[in-house]
């Protein structure tokens, strides 16, 4: 089957890889001159299935009000003048109760754990290089309340069979030795030993090269004007004066998916702006070993070979990509506070990207009402964590194979009234 994939970020390229491996003739289209040059370029670098959780959580509405008056707040909102933003925020607020949080986190962890397994298999099969580390993730708590709240997430981890360690502050240095110097600032941590780290851009570009060698065609520097449809199916992609035709089409444009699908399929994907610093390592024994998550500031500190990536924060501000100095100061403050000897912060590269977020935090993966239009978007801050699993799942569905995990509650249909997913663990055949 001829398949066109729109988007060459980590999700689009992973989709191309798995569809090619399933025997399809794949073409990837992107406006950029190469793969992973937008949202996948400099994300936090963590592959943390156990920490997969929606921003829509109990207590967030009240916290959001408090954060409005804090200099280093992890969340900021600025109205962009669109009804879509208001509707999206309202849907997000409706997901902030405990029952929705547990449901959403459960399916996010399910997909993320599966994705980590897919990445492990891909690594074993291809020996793909991306400065990966398999040293786990350590979530740090600065208050006793945060430490106590961890028990809520532990319930989900236990249900999913995810191993963990809940550590008091005196034991944090067993996992991250450099934290011995700052343990007095912390109340404890939650460590997930099976989590990983890696450079998402390096992974995506290397996978794109391997996919191209396997027969995938990449059409870079090719802006997409619109999808052409006749009411029942898509019959082409208009790129300037050219119409590119295929048997199936996959939307993986990230935050830009919503606008491209306007008038065809309504999807609640909105850009969530984030920032990162990439810092050269100064002292090896003062740098992180793997990934740290600062629960207070919602910031991740990730170790690559000779660099530290510091990333996080969420701004609901539309498609604004301005680099704001106060955000840089927050990232610098957190990394200096936890790893004062770790990196040459003054030499850091500052970056921002737009993560495609759904109100419930879960991506939309699967077929639409059009029989040949498929979605793989809306992964929010977890595109790197979920990319391989989402790509494999999409490939299975499009190819008519039964996926390895429950999938019905991952489709855009969950936003339809009256939608009832199958019981967990029960799998139907593909729709196609």
Curated annotation (Swiss-Prot):
Binding site for FAD: 3-17
Pathways involved: Amino-acid degradation; D-alanine degradation; NH(3) and pyruvate from D-alanine: step 1/1
Catalytic activity: a D-alpha-amino acid + A + H2O = a 2-oxocarboxylate + AH2 + NH4(+)
Keywords of the record: FAD, Flavoprotein, Oxidoreductase
Entry's Gene Ontology cellular component terms: cytoplasm; plasma membrane
Pfam families xref list: DAO
Molecular function GO labels: D-amino-acid dehydrogenase activity
GO biological process: D-alanine catabolic process
Entry-linked InterPro entries: DadA (IPR023080), FAD-dep_OxRdtase (IPR006076), FAD/NAD-bd_sf (IPR036188)
EC number: 1.4.99.-
Chain's role: Oxidative deamination of D-amino acids.
Similarity comment: Belongs to the DadA oxidoreductase family.
Protein name, per record: D-amino acid dehydrogenase
Organism encoding this protein: Shigella boydii serotype 18 (strain CDC 3083-94 / BS512)
Organismal lineage: Bacteria, Pseudomonadati, Pseudomonadota, Gammaproteobacteria, Enterobacterales
Gene expressing this chain: dadA
